[in-house]
């Protein structure tokens, strides 16, 4: 079975000899390792993860599809690999690489390879990632199930007198306690007239009143895969107007 990096290189034009991946999410997708730093260099016949001393032990233990190299002088290491594989054209992540990072890369290796900063690499990565394996689907389902379980816990607790901030923290804690590695995004919890704001900010000063709406927008991360759900509930008995509005939005 092909590795993800082998699949990626197959999707790139034949004129591309290698690809450099530096964004956190794509690095994790292709190596299976979560880190805040590291560089993946993929060639037609090999792939490398260059990573600093903070992550080297973990990388050597869990990364299977790349040769792991401890970072010393990053650009010297990249140069050596480009020369070793006789690469002439390298694709970069145009959507995520900063201008400063691109300028530094070009200054260091521009005499060896032509840097392709078109959308060719980003498009190939998107194509790889949009087709989910059964294992990926299971992780997505697990993230959603975790969020739903957290919501059930919060609904059992929810009552008049708590603040929007209380609800936010309760949801966050429930998801993390259930095993989420992170939150999909900052949790939104709003009540009363603020529920008309899709992306409002929870406030400590806003208190849930009897018979009021509470809107919650939240999600959990499981093994790098995110869930995202929005739910609106009524704390107490809704008025007929509230029922009509709720059903219209539904």
Report each predicted region and the residues it spans.
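Active-site neighborhoods and metal-handling regions in enzymes and metal-associated proteins
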Residues: 1-250
């Amino acid at each position: 079975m092909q590795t993800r990096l082998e699949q990626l290189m197959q999707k790139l034009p034949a004129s591309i000899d290698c690809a450099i991946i530096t964004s956190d999410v794509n690095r994790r997708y292709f190596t299976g390792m979560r880190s805040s730093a590291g560089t993946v260099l993929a060639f037609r016949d090999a792939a490398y993860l260059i990573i600093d001393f903070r992550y080297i032990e973990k990388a050597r233990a869990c990364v299977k599809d790349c040769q792991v190299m401890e970072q010393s002088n990053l650009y010297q290491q990249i140069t050596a690999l480009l020369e070793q594989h006789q690469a002439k054209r390298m694709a970069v992540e145009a959507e995520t690489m900063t201008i400063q990072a691109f300028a530094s890369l070009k200054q260091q290796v521009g005499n060896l390879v032509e840097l392709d900063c078109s959308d060719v690499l980003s498009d190939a990565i998107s194509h790889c990632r949009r087709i989910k394996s059964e294992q990926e689907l299971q992780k997505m389902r697990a993230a959603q199930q975790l969020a739903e379980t957290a919501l059930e816990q919060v609904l059992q607790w929810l009552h008049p007198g708590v603040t929007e901030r209380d609800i936010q923290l309760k949801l966050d804690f429930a998801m993390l306690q259930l095993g989420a590695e992170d939150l999909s995004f900052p949790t939104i919890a709003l009540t009363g007239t603020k529920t008309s704001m899709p992306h409002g900010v929870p406030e400590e000063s806003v208190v849930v009143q009897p018979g009021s709406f509470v809107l919650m927008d939240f999600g959990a991360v499981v093994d790098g895969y995110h869930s995202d759900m929005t739910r609106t509930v009524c704390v107490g008995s809704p008025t007929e107007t509230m029922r009509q509005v709720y059903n219209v939005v539904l």
